[in-house]
UniProtKB/Swiss-Prot annotation:
GO cellular component: cytoplasm; ribonucleoprotein complex; ribosome
Entry similarity comment: Belongs to the bacterial ribosomal protein bL36 family.
InterPro entries according to UniProt: Ribosomal_bL36, Ribosomal_bL36_sp
Organism: Prochlorococcus marinus (strain MIT 9515)
GO molecular function: structural constituent of ribosome
SUPFAM superfamilies (alphabetical): Ribosomal protein L36
Keywords attached to this entry: Ribonucleoprotein, Ribosomal protein
Gene Ontology BP annotations: translation
Superkingdom, taxonomy of origin: Bacteria
HAMAP family membership: Ribosomal_bL36
PROSITE patterns: RIBOSOMAL_L36 (PS00828)
This protein's name: Large ribosomal subunit protein bL36B
Length: 38
């Protein structure tokens, strides 16, 4: 899980979602693309 100031989709399988008021990126194709804003 990368913690970044700005989260972006890294591939076309990435999805931007909100959990508990935080913006996150989850990816089914490659879990290395997981990010959280903070």
């Amino acid at each position: 899980m990368k913690v970044r100031a700005s989260v972006k989709k890294m591939c076309d399988k990435c999805r931007v979602i909100r959990r508990h008021g935080r913006v996150m990126v989850i990816c089914t194709a490659s879990p290395r693309h997981k990010q959280r804003q903070g």
